[in-house]
Amino acid sequence: MFILLLCLFIGFALRYYHLDQKSLWMDEVHTYNDSRDGFGDQIKFYKENPTFLHPPLFFVLTHLFYPFSKPELDIRIIPLIAGTLSIPMIYLFARSFAPQISIPCMVALTFMAYHISLSQDGRSYAILMFFGMVSLYFFMQHLKTSKKKYLIVTALFYALLFYTSYSSIPFILFSQILWFYKLEDHQKTPSLSSFLIQIAFTLLFILPWIIFVVSSYKGQIIMDPTHKEDPGPLWSLLYGILHDWVPFAPLIIASSALLILFPVFAKQRRNSLVLLAVLLSPMVGLWLYCKWFNVTHFITSRYFITFVPLFLISLFLSLLSIEFRFERIKRYLHLRFLFLFLFIASNLVILPLYYRHQKQDNRGLIVYLKEHLRGGDKIFTETESYFPAILHYFGVYPQGRHHVAKSWKDSENKTVYSISFVFQNKNITLFSSKTCCSQYVNDGSRLWIVAGKWTAKRIKENSPSVLKGYFDGSFLNFTRFPVDASIYLFLLDPKSPGEKGIDMPIE
């Protein structure tokens, strides 16, 4: 009990530290906009937009802290609570598999930089993982006791997952493989009625929303046409997940070896294969789905956040199996605690860097622009995805749920997006397109260029614009953890060709 309370205290401290010090990044600004509506307005929005990619539960919960007097804190409270509660929850969940791994799993999650980052992120990932753990905890309780009441609770938390994010659907589907898991050698095979009860109650809880969405569908577009990303090769996806969950090469190699050796040394090989199937099936399945149906969207480890507890459990069960197989080694080396030490050390290397750096310093960018903008200035961004964050920190909020940009085709048949707004009696226009930048300064206007690192390198080499600012974004949890989402600000002023900028390398 002392270790549990200590981990809970340390885990909360690590997840609360600097919680409101980091600027909102672009996805968190979407959370801000999506959570301004109360329950009634949420239902109205989904009736008009039934194909919106995110169901409403997380936004309804976040709305409890509206009007968001301090957004950097308010929209991160739910993830903070869920991330902290996940620490005692993984203790209980891991104990369902083997009491010997409950403390190592709990300690590992306490210091896991990846989980800490998502517990400080105003998105639904932390609460998804918590709901997922609770659902499987009661699932395992049913397998242990055969009591049907646990299936109803499992179904309830499956439904909460579904109402929080549609990305939980693979988790709900593939976690059914756990029906083949045997906690004891003498355990009876679960009855078909148990499986049907769980499925029936899950459908009972989620069908109202499915019926609502289907009945509201009037031919609205399903996939966002602006997403053109390639999911990439399968090996890259699997490596990316390992890279995020177990940082640095020594830990990646050790974890990969443990997963491979798990069926070799496990006393119950069937159970090890079941756990590995639960882990790998959704990753391979989602990748195949994107390939077969030409879904153009990146796949990130965050989409599999609900599987992190099973991943940790599999690692420590593998270590436990090796210790049981080689009892002589156990007298001198406790492999579980050696691995736990490596896990904690690897994450403690990352944590100081994570706390020191920003996710994406949109707030700092706008503070600088507010001091230097003149009437008639234009702001160009390499992608329109920058628009919501820039407008948010200028205090320009959408009239509805989201900003609506004007769009047209330029002379090169490229789509141009623009939004105009007034700041301190100055008319400012935001632009974004695939071509830049002479067309925006032909009238003598100054052009501020907002770019990421790779575009900034090209601009610095090939453009007469000068670098005016750098705004840190070294530790964003996006396509990988961490990703460098730093922002570089350039100024192109046709009336001042001798404008001075800052001299810094872009690496």
Set out the residue ranges of the language-model regions.
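N-terminal membrane topogenic signal
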Residues: 1-4
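Membrane-proximal helix-loop-helix interfaces that form the catalytic/acceptor-binding platform
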Residues: 7, 11-327, 339-506
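A conserved nucleotide-sugar
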Residues: 330
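C-terminal beta-strand-loop-alpha-helix "lid" module of Rossmann-like NAD(P)-dependent dehydrogenases
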Residues: 334-335
